[in-house]
Amino acid sequence: MLKSRLRMFLNELKLLVLTGGGRPRAEPQPRGGRGGGCGWAPFAGCSTRDGDGDEEEYYGSEPRARGLAGDKEPRAGPLPPPAPPLPPPGALDALSLSSSLDSGLRTPQCRICFQGPEQGELLSPCRCDGSVRCTHQPCLIRWISERGSWSCELCYFKYQVLAISTKNPLQWQAISLTVIEKVQIAAIVLGSLFLVASISWLIWSSLSPSAKWQRQDLLFQICYGMYGFMDVVCIGLIIHEGSSVYRIFKRWQAVNQQWKVLNYDKTKDIGGDAGGGTAGKSGPRNSRTGPTSGATSRPPAAQRMRTLLPQRCGYTILHLLGQLRPPDARSSSHSGREVVMRVTTV
């Protein structure tokens, strides 16, 4: 068996050597098609049948099915429709920018949930303007219940809300509390109970006729001092943790009560700035540090009087200080006082 396979292999090797050396080698053709298909004239002695002869020698003379990759001639079929011309990149950027601006101007969004009016009515509860102006009432109530503050964190305006009614006790919801908040609530409750009990006992033992023997005993007098000290400690603890517990109570109240949030009314805002509400502290800071913005609405006489008053006050104060000094010190420091007055005037 092995010998027969070796003989067959040697015979095939001899045949391959003889056929490869006796026939001229075909020139390579371009991939685009047959000889001369790319625009170049075929070489002399080069036949287009060489490739077909090789295929016939390798595959045989029987017809075979050609694959997609082996088709010599392109198949005729419907051409795809031409693609529409693309606009230049600058036009695409301008189109996207204009669409985003139009969508931002036409559809305001809630600054908490980033949803539009389809999720509910949008309110404007504070002085904030721009993209942080609107919010949904349920989103605002939920934010207040999480934060515990009824003022805007940007413009510090206190929300105008109306308490409609308290929910049914069966519908009350618990709020999320941290470990520190639970400890604060426990400290307030225990301190209040101890304070009430100790003060009640002290009042009874000091006023009741039946406790006359207790007031005369030394041990009870020591207890009076200890209870008095613990009462002071409990009062300090309640004062220290009272604000935190009150904030927790306001959070719970925001969840378990029905509210109606009112829109910001500029005419009723006494402490608001004249500009009408930019977010943050820019309004009060500008009103304090920018006198030119408010001076445009004042008459010139009032503006001049306002600028002269600080200078006259400075002169008056320096004059009084100079009169209080002794005569020798006043004469020796006359030049120094002149310098101070000039600096104040500048």
Curated annotation (Swiss-Prot):
UniProt-listed Enzyme Commission number(s): 2.3.2.27
List of residues binding Zn(2+) 2: 126, 128, 152, 155
Residue spans of biased composition, Basic and acidic residues class: 63-75
InterPro entries: MARCHF4/9/11 (IPR046356), MARCHF9_RING_CH-C4HC3 (IPR047904), Znf_RING-CH (IPR011016), Znf_RING/FYVE/PHD (IPR013083)
Entry protein name: E3 ubiquitin-protein ligase MARCHF9
Record comment regarding domains: The RING-CH-type zinc finger domain is required for E3 ligase activity.
UniProt pathway: Protein modification; protein ubiquitination
Family annotation (PROSITE patterns): ZF_RING_CH
SMART domains: RINGv (SM00744)
Record membrane topology: Multi-pass membrane protein
Organism from which the protein derives: Homo sapiens (Human)
Binding site for Zn(2+) 1: 110, 113, 136, 139
Record-linked SUPFAM superfamilies: RING/U-box
Top-level taxonomic group: Eukaryota
CDD domains, per the entry: RING_CH-C4HC3_MARCH4_9
Keywords: Golgi apparatus, Lysosome, Membrane, Metal-binding, Transferase, Transmembrane, Transmembrane helix, Ubl conjugation pathway, Zinc, Zinc-finger
Compartments it resides in: Golgi apparatus membrane; Lysosome membrane
Reactions listed under catalytic activity: S-ubiquitinyl-[E2 ubiquitin-conjugating enzyme]-L-cysteine + [acceptor protein]-L-lysine = [E2 ubiquitin-conjugating enzyme]-L-cysteine + N(6)-ubiquitinyl-[acceptor protein]-L-lysine
Gene Ontology, cellular component aspect: Golgi membrane; Golgi stack; lysosomal membrane; trans-Golgi network
Membrane-spanning parts: 185-205, 219-239
Compositionally skewed regions (Pro residues) per UniProt: 77-90
Subcellular location, principal: Golgi
Enzyme class: transferase
Zinc finger region(s), RING-CH-type: 102-162
Tissue: Ubiquitously expressed.
GO-annotated molecular function: ubiquitin-protein transferase activity; zinc ion binding
